């Protein structure tokens, strides 16, 4: 969507799209992710967001076997790949620790689009990691919460996102869980 701004006492009018976010080309912290989401919702209450938490299941083992330098390179590859995958559709960040990431993507209107995006994201990360080190096959536990499907409060959706990720990890990892109240319960 586009908003038009006219400054008082000015002859100029300019438009700015809500897709344009000054920090979209870097990893954000918790505050940046929340600010991005709340700003976009204030522009358009009809936005649909997918909150995707990506936990790399086997990254610690990779660090133990390949060392800190290779581990840091893999983390950089994952960050760069997430930013490329998201592009103009949202933002990415790692608010909790260096091995878990949160991606917030707009305008995935149904579950098939969401699943396709997740598979695309996983494939790109695997491809880029294997280009660096063919021996590393990243495994993912992914939790997904959705706005407005899982609520309209940022903290509630974040808690559901965390619960979905915990469920994926507890089931043995290397899977994704889309949080659904009728299956996973209310928080």
Predicted regions mapped to residue ranges:
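Short catalytic/binding micro-motifs of nucleotide second-messenger systems
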Residues: 84-89, 122-135, 167
